[in-house]
Structure formats: C-alpha cells, structure tokens
From Swiss-Prot:
Biological role stated in the UniProt entry: Probable substrate-recognition component of a SCF (SKP1-CUL1-F-box protein)-type E3 ubiquitin ligase complex which mediates the ubiquitination and subsequent proteasomal degradation of target proteins. Overexpression is leading to degradation of CBX5 and CBX1.
Key words, A-Z: Coiled coil, Repeat, Ubl conjugation pathway, WD repeat
Signal peptide per UniProt: none
Source taxonomy: Eukaryota, Metazoa, Chordata, Craniata, Vertebrata
Pfam families: WD40
Keyword Repeat: yes
WD repeats: 169-206, 409-447, 451-490, 493-532, 534-569, 572-609, 611-652
Coiled coil spans: 690-719, 986-1010
Biased composition (Basic and acidic residues): 775-786
Species in which this protein is naturally found: Homo sapiens
Domain F-box: start-end pairs: 276-323
Protein name from the UniProt record: F-box/WD repeat-containing protein 10
Length: 1052
C-alpha cells in the first residue's frame, strides 16, 4: 500500500488488500476510509439545499492548502469558463426562492444533523494527506451542478493567486508550471499518467523556502527512471509549499471550517487584475461614456453592478430630458426666421456652358486665370475661361418661413424605408412587409403587401396611378396594386440586392449591388437597357433623356437613354455617393465625405461648379428653385443658396440628432424619415413677391405720395402760411394750416412732420378775419381765383424732381434755408399768382402756438371747397416788384504767384466782385439808367404795382436779447463713481489725504505744462482778438516779455 501511495494516476482504482470477500473494506487503511467518506457524502450532499452545498464545497477547497493541487484543479475547471456554462449560470431559477422558505421543525433538525456531518468530514479532510484530498475533491466535483462548478472555479482561482502572492521571492511565473505526460505513457492506459514538472529553461530558479543550492527538479534526464524523478518532484513541492498533510496550522479551530455566506460571496465573485474604470472615473465622465451606447446596450450595462445600474438610470433620465428639450426647440424653430425674407422670389439669368456640335464646351480664346477669394466663389465665377450663355431661371426662398411639425411615427428603426409622392399616403417598410400610413388621420391602413422573401430596400409609391413598386433583398422588384394589395407583376434580372429605384412616366430605373443599372418598361415588365459600373450602385435618377447613377467608388455617370451610351463620368468625391438629383441644367450629388457637389448637365461639361460642406455624410439631396436642400447624418436639414453657396436655414429633424435617412417634398409639405421617427413639416402658404413686382409697387407708392405732396403744396400755396419746426411740438405729427386771430396781419403756421405725408389735416378758421372793405373787391377776387384755377394745370407747371428732404431730420439752419428758397421761388415770375397771400417766417426758437387749435380731417371730402374758403377769407392786395441794382467789378488774377509755369493755360474763371449799389451812391438821385434795373422793374401779366416788403433772413446778432430766446439745452450732470475714484482701497488719515490731493494736483499741473503749444495758433488767436478790439494782455509773444509799466500791450 505504501508503494502505491505516490501513484496518482492509479488513485481512483486503489483497493484494500486486507479486506475479505464478505467485508471488502477494513475501515482502517487510507483507501477504505476514503471510500467510506465518499459513500456517506453521497447520501446527504445531493439532498441539501444550494447554500449548504456551496458552503461545504468552499470549505473543502479552502483546506487544500497546496499550490500544486490548486493549479491542478484550476486546469481541470478551465472548461467552465465556456459560453455554455456562462449561459447556464446567467439563468434564473424561479422555482427556488432561497432565504424565503419557511422551514419546519423536522427540516431544522435534519439541517443540524447534516451540518454536524459536514464539520466532521471537513475536520477529517483537513488532517488528510495530499493524495486523499485530491481524490475526495475530484469525486465531490463530480456531484456538483454547473453553478457549483463555476463557483468552485472562481474560488480556486482566488485561492491560487493568494497562495502565489504569499510566497515571497517567487520569480517563476505560474505559466512555467504545467502538467505533462510521462515518456513511457501508453495510449491504451485507462487513466492519464501525468506528473508535475517545470518547463525547461536556460537556468533553474530557486524557490523561496529552499536554500540557494536546492532547485526545482525538472523532467527526468534519465529515461530509465521517470517514476523516481516524478516522486522526488512531488514530494519536494509538497514539502516546500504545504508541508506535511497531517500537521495542522497554528490556531486551527475545527468549529470554523464551515465558511460563512459573506466569505463565499467574496471568494466566488472572482479575482481579477482588472478594475472597474467606470467606478473610478468622475460621474460626469462615466455618464458621458455610457451616453454613447444605444438603449439596448445601456439596459445590459445595468446588470453589471449596482453602480453601473445607477449610472445607466441617470443616463436614461438625462437622455429623456435632453430629447424633450430638443423636441421643444424643434417645434419652436418653425416660427422663427433668421432675417431671411421667406416671400422672396425672382427670375435671374444663370450662366450655362455653351456647347459645340460634339457636345464639348467652348473655351475663351485668351484665358485669364485668377485666384478667387472666399466671397468670390459663386456660380458666375465657376465658369472661368468658359464661354457661357444666359438662361432665365426662377429662384425662391423655399422652406425658409414658419412651419408646423407633425409626428407620423415614433418608432425607432434604422432600416426603415419610406416613399411619399404627394397625396395622403406614405409607403413604409423595414422588413419583408409593406404597409401604408395615412398622414391625415396618422394611422396605418389595414392593407399589407406581403410576398418578398427578403427585406425591402427601395420603394416607389404612385398614388395617382394606384400602384406601388418595391425592390428587395431577394433580387426582385414587385408591382403592387394599392387597393387590393396584390402583386400583379415581378421584375426579375438583377443578381444583387436592389438598392435604389426611380420612375419617369412608364420607364423604371433600378440599381443593385450587382453593379448594374437596368431600365424597365412598367407596363410590360421587360428590361429595356442595362448599364454597368465597377462597384455596387447606391443611387440612380431618370428623366426623359438621361439616367444618372452613382456607386460606392464615388463616381457619377450620366447615360443617354435613347442612344444607350455613356455621356460623361463625374469624379471628385472621396467617398461613396449615396444620393443624386438633377434637372434640365444642373446635377447634385451627395457623398459620405460630407460634400454636396453641383455639376452641369449641359453636354460633356465635367467641372464641379459648387460644393456645399456638411459635418457628416449626406444621405439625401434635392434642388428646388435654385435652393439646395440636403439631409445630413447629424440630424439636420440644410437649405443652401445654389448661386453663392450660403446656408440660409437649418432645420432640426429631432432632438436626439438621429440621422435623416431621406425626405420628400411636395408643395409646401416635407416628409422626413429619420432613424427614430417619421415627421411631416407643414409650411405656411406663401404669396411670392417677385423683385419686378416690388419695384412696380414701390414706384406706384411713390407716385401716390408725390400726388399727395403736390396737392398739399397746392393748398399751402393758396393761403398765408407760416412754417413751424417739429421741434416746437413733439406731440404734433401732422401737417396743419392755421388761420390767425383777428387784429393781426394775415399769418398761418405749418407744422411739417419728418415722415412721409400720409394725410393732410387742416385747421379750421377759428374766427372771421373781418369783412372785406368793398363787395366789388370780393367779386374781383372770386373772378381772379377762378382764372387762376384755369391757369394751374399740370401741363403748364414746370417739372421739378421730387424732394425727400422732409423725410429726414434736419438742423434748424437747414430748415430755415429751405423755407427761404421756397419763398424766393414762390415770389418769382414763374410761380407768381394774383391774390396769393404772403408768408412770414417764425423763428424756429420762438414760442410754440399758445392758442387752441381745431383740427379738421378732410379725408374723403372735397379739398377744393376748403381751398376756396381759405382763398376767400383773405382779401387780396396789390403787388409791386422792385429790385436793387448790382455793381459788378471784374478782377485780373495775379499769375506771377501761380504754382504753374506761364505756358500752362489756366482754366480758372475770371474773378469778379458783385455788390449792391445803394441809392445814396447813385448819380442823379432816383434816376434809374441801368438796363438790368429796367428789366427787373418790368411788370408781367400776373404782377401788380404795389410794393411788397421783402422777407429777409437776417443773421441774429450775438447779444443777450437773442440768446434769451434760444432754448437752453438741458445740462447733464454725471456723478462720479466712488468705485472708480477709490480703486486702490487705501485707508488714509486727513493729513495723508491732503498730501495725496496735493501730489495729484502737482502731477496734473506738470502734465499740463508739458503740453506743446503751437505758436502759429497762438499768434492767429492774438490777431483775431486785436481785430475785434479785445485786449491781448494774456498773450505772450515768442521771445518777448510783457512790460505793462511802460504801457498797454508793450513787450520787451
């Protein structure tokens, strides 16, 4: 028996040699004791609960106390880390609720009995040899279920790392220790013959507990003695690491052999060199990392630990709040415009390349290349050195106004495909089924379209003609009837997944991953033409003449349908082109490189015209009224001006920033498909205002304003008025004509508003001006007034440009000069009317009107009646015009002091002096001999001989009388800021404060004295004072000193 003790390979097959046939076990030898203990363990181990089984198993594993045995069992249980064991462990057994079962008294007695047996076996196991421990543990693991095996594997891994760390100076990694078969091992043997050995190295490493000259023995060098070397290795390792099996540890208590549940939880949780980085990071960084996960993965993270569950819950709440805020912003942005005129429309001339017969563009004869700045990049400069022709195209600021948002579907699906062609239905599919969505009632129609064997990847709905086209992963295109949902036709021919489709009349074009573009006849289902790329097709478009297709390589090809040939290939994108749009003149392509490129559809012109940059890949694009509409993967729809590349508006599809997969435009309605929902933007109905109509409306408005002003000036010209400044009465905003009080000369006031004349309001006559001196004179006045009305025709009046000086604020001097010019023009012969009352100018600084006014609004009434009443209320007077002769004296310029040579011909007019010749200086007293005077004194048919006192504007003299009339301007007193003065926050005494003030004053005086004085300016100021007769005592001449003792203004 002692000879076979070390043969572990035959350990399960050891038998007692002392036993008889009637009693096979002697119960004295180690083999019989082991067999009896295993038999008794099988009786109760499978009947106890999971907690007791786990406690007993962990207690057994803790008593191994051998690095060799721990490594041996770790290798055996390594298969428990596979996916099948992990899946079985993650399952929850709902039939057993541990800890909540009410135990009866009998069960409690049985538990106590079983616990006593477990303690006895643990005590026996702790005092057993390594051979007994190895065999009993192997047989015990055979009775464990998968969950217990996983627990055992975790506990053994933790215990092994603990034992390894307890050995100080262990320089050999555990990977250098392994099991290897003996060299004389036969494959026919029932058990595997293994022994523990160290991997061969260049140098042997000593163990910590051994002397320096003792080394771990490797494999047997002599092939004749494998068993001795194996025995020596095992005994040496057992001696070094665990000592003798029958020696218990100091302080060993057999009552504590059963492990508590807390210790089991700590051991079975596993031991790893990795750390939970989410727990160690700050909370905001942990939430930022978890926020990058999708919702499904975030729900899984909540099962990792309590900390992760709390973080995941907070991230969900933050995402929900952020989404709510962004959705509110999305709804509110529909009623906000960034200074863009949403009603703008115009017809502009757009350059297009001029082509020759072979379809190539014409270049200029003498090309000039010029570097363009950022502001110079537009459509007109894109055709550099190319001959172009102008095409009239309409432009509008589409989708720049206010809009309402309606959610049609709120289901997250990144594989959703939709199509909308106007009307009330939307075709939606994300798998093999297709259903229709009513956008008015926001509900699905019960008709479903089934028949595809694979998921649907392309749709085209034609609601007007009552059919639906769908392209699928099953390589087929199906033609469906909308009302019945029956597939009536199948288009077969593609050898790859259908990725895109487009329809024009009865021609269908489709592209697939088989690098083919096929043209079909919708009525017959036959393939008419096939075009090929070298890469899978991602987008295709068709019209009556051309087909445009793009592929994953980034190439865009234009095909001619009738001729079935390639027109041109457009290259410039660095990524796959996913979307296309083209019309008669231009082509747009959107790519994964974040660019939308504009090309010309005319002939074979292949140069890129414009590029519109996006932060992420472009998924859909359209061109409408010279406005580029693009959908980006950042969740925004952008509207660009095609002419200059400016971004006019940005529409957010949702608050989460999900990519906009596609959008469809019909009228003032836009249907948007994102990964998280389907939206409809309903824009307001806009009446477009073209630039030509605006100019016409502006001209008509100006003509109406001119007519109103002319009628107002006609009224003012027929009455005695006084012009009053708006500064006198701020509350008065209208034009007023006021009759004067009796006893004063005929006078009236006019208050001019600075804005345009929207209406004219007359002040009614407050009191009669008195009866006329003779009724004959009144009759004559009426007669003359009627004659005057006949003479005042628009054709006879001279044409004058419209003056807009009243529409802008002016200074008082400008206002008085304007009134004076009007008076002189009024007194001239061209505007001289009989019976026209004179006007006098009231000083602009004079007092405002103190007497009450009665305002009469004659809007809608006859103005002529009011004019006649005002004309008859003022008696006419005779008018005589006089003039003062002028004296003109011509001067000869002195050319000697000219800066130019005498040979240079001068263009300066001859100077002259013009001054009035007064009566005292004239020879002959009152005789008038001047021809100019005779011409001036001649009377016309509309003049009289009575003298008029001229209305002159005299410059006010500087004096107290004039200054008193002027309004004193309000003085603004600003208090000093104490914080600005006491910026240093220094506490000073009274004496220190005085010293500080004196120092500041000296500093200020020194700064003022150092100022540079211009001697020229000082001399000029002195001469001016001397001319005015003012003293110049304070004037100091340069280099001289004033000597007042010698006399006034005497300098030495």
């Amino acid at each position: 028996m002692e000879n076979l003790e070390s043969r572990l390979k035959n350990a399960p097959y050891f038998r007692c040699e002392k036993g008889t046939d009637s009693i096979p076990l002697c119960r004295k030898c180690e083999t019989c004791v082991l067999a009896w203990k295993i038999f008794s363990t099988k009786e109760w181990f499978c009947r106890i609960n999971d907690i007791s089984q786990r406690r007993f198993l962990v207690g057994i594993l803790k008593q191994l106390n051998s690095l060799y045995l721990l490594h041996y069992f770790q290798n055996i249980l390594q298969t428990t880390q596979g996916k099948d064991f992990i899946y079985n462990r993650s399952r929850i057994n709902l039939s057993k609720k541990e800890g909540k079962v009410v135990k009866s008294s009998l069960n409690q007695m049985l538990d106590k009995t079983v616990e006593q047996k477990m303690k006895e076996i643990l005590y026996w196991f702790a005092n057993s040899t390594q051979w007994t421990k190895a065999n009993y543990t192997l047989l015990l693991l055979q009775m464990c279920n998968p969950k217990l095996l996983l627990t055992a594997a975790n506990v053994i891994r933790v215990l092994f790392l603990r034992e390894e760390n307890n050995i100080s100076g262990l320089n050999q990694d555990i990977t250098d220790v392994c099991f290897s078969p003996e060299k004389d091992h036969s494959s026919k043997s029932a058990t595997s013959q293994v022994y523990w050995t160290a991997k061969t190295q260049h140098t042997s490493l000593p163990l910590s507990k051994a002397p320096e000259n003792e080394h771990l023995l490797g494999a047997a060098s002599n092939p004749e003695e494998p068993w001795r070397n194996s025995l020596r290795c095992i005994s040496e390792m057992n001696r070094l690491f665990s000592g003798k099996g029958d020696i218990t540890k100091p302080g060993y208590d057999p009552c504590n052999l059963l492990v508590d549940l807390d210790d089991i939880r700590d051991l079975s949780s596993g031991f790893s060199k990795y750390r939970d980085f989410i727990r160690y990071l700050p909370i905001h960084l942990s939430k930022y990392i978890l926020r990058m996960l999708d919702r499904h993965t975030l729900n899984k993270c909540a099962s990792v630990s309590q900390h992760w569950a709390a973080m995941a819950q907070q991230v969900k709440m933050d995402l929900s709040a952020h989404g709510f805020i962004q959705n509110q912003i999305t709804f509110l942005q529909g009623s906000y415009t960034r200074g863009i005129d949403p009603n703008y429309a115009n017809k502009v001339s757009i350059p297009v390349p001029k082509m020759v017969d072979d379809g190539k563009s014409m270049r200029v004869k003498h090309p000039k290349w010029k570097l363009r700045t950022k502001n110079e990049y537009n459509l007109w400069t894109a055709y550099q050195n190319e001959e172009t022709q102008q095409v009239l195209i309409e432009e509008r600021n589409v989708f720049c106004g206010t809009y309402n948002v309606r959610i049609l579907s709120d289901t997250w699906d990144q594989n959703r495909v939709i199509h909308y062609s106007g009307g009330d239905l939307i075709a939606v599919s994300s798998n093999r089924k297709i259903h229709l969505l009513d956008i008015i009632q926001v509900k699905a129609i019960p008709v479903e379209f089934r028949g595809h064997a694979g998921s649907v990847r392309a749709l085209f709905l034609c609601e007007e003609e009552n059919f639906l086209l769908s392209g699928s992963y099953d390589l087929s295109i199906r033609y469906w009837d909308l009302k019945s949902g029956v597939c009536t036709r199948i288009f077969g021919g593609h050898q790859g997944t259908i990725t895109c489709m487009d329809l024009c009349k009865n021609r269908l074009v489709s592209g697939g991953r088989d690098c083919q573009v096929k043209v079909w006849d919708v009525d017959t289902g036959k393939c008419l033409k096939t075009f090929r790329h070298k890469d899978p097709i991602l987008a295709t478009r068709i019209n009556d003449t051309y087909i445009v297709s793009s592929c994953e390589r980034g190439l865009v090809k234009v095909w001619h349908i009738a001729m079935a040939q390639l027109v041109k290939t457009l290259s410039g994108h660095e990524g796959a082109v996913k979307c296309l749009f083209f019309d008669q003149w231009h082509l747009l392509s959107g790519s994964t490189d974040g660019l939308v490129m504009a090309w010309s559809m005319v002939g074979k012109y292949e140069r890129c015209l414009m590029a519109f940059k996006h932060p992420k890949e472009v998924l859909d694009v359209s061109l409408l009224f010279l406005r580029v509409i693009s959908a980006c993967a950042d969740g925004k729809i952008r509207i660009y001006n095609f002419l200059n590349g400016n971004c006019m508006k940005v529409l957010k599809a949702n608050g989460r920033g999900d990519p906009v997969l596609s959008f469809f435009i019909q009228g003032n309605r836009m249907v948007v498909n994102t990964e998280s929902n389907v939206l409809m933007f309903q824009f307001e109905h806009i009446k477009w205002q073209y630039a030509v109509e605006k100019t016409k409306q502006k001209k008509n408005k100006e003509k109406e304003e001119e007519k109103e002003e002319n009628s107002l000036m006609e009224i003012l010209s027929k009455c005695n008025i006084q012009v009053h400044s708006p500064r006198e009465s701020v509350s008065s905003k209208q034009t007023v004509i006021q009759e004067l009080l009796p006893g004063k000369p005929p006078k009236s006031r006019v208050l001019l508003k600075p804005a345009k004349f929207s209406s004219a309001v007359l002040i009614e006559e407050l009191q009669s001006q008195g009866k006329s001196k003779s009724p004959r004179r009144d009759a004559d006045d009426v007669e003359k007034a009627q004659k005057q009305g006949q003479l005042e025709t628009p054709g006879k009046l001279p044409s004058h440009p419209k003056k807009k000086s009243w529409k802008i604020p002016m200074s008082p001097d400008q206002f008085l000069l304007t009134v004076s010019a009007l008076q002189h023009a009024h007194n001239s012969g061209e505007f001289a009317y009989p019976c026209r009352p004179q006007t006098e100018i009231t000083d602009v600084w004079g007092p405002s009107i103190s007497y009450p006014r009665k305002v009469l609004n004659f809007k809608g009434k006859s103005i002529q009646r009011a004019v006649d009443r005002l004309r008859l209320s003022n008696p006419p007077i005779d008018v005589k015009r006089t003039s003062i002769p002028l004296e003109i004296q011509k001067l000869q310029p002195n050319l000697k002091i000219s800066l130019h040579s005498p040979r240079v011909q001068s263009t300066i007019p001859q100077p002259m002096i013009i001054r009035s010749r007064f009566s005292g200086s004239l020879k002959g007293g009152d005789q008038v001999t001047s021809s100019i005077e005779r011409a001036v004194c001649s009377t016309g048919p509309l003049t009289s001989m009575q003298v008029i006192k001229p209305n002159r504007m005299l410059a006010p003299q500087v004096g107290t009388a004039t200054l008193s009339l002027k309004k004193e301007r309000p003085r603004i007193y600003t208090a000093l800021d104490p914080f600005r003065v006491n910026t240093e926050f220094v506490l000073l005494t009274v004496k220190e404060e005085k010293e500080h003030q004196e120092a500041k004053m000296k500093e200020y005086q020194a700064r003022e004295s150092t100022g540079v004085v211009d001697p020229g300016k000082v001399s000029k100021a002195a001469w001016i004072r001397k001319i005015k007769g003012l003293p110049i005592d304070n004037f100091t001449k340069q280099g001289k000193t004033a000597a007042p003792e010698l006399g006034q203004n005497v300098f030495i």
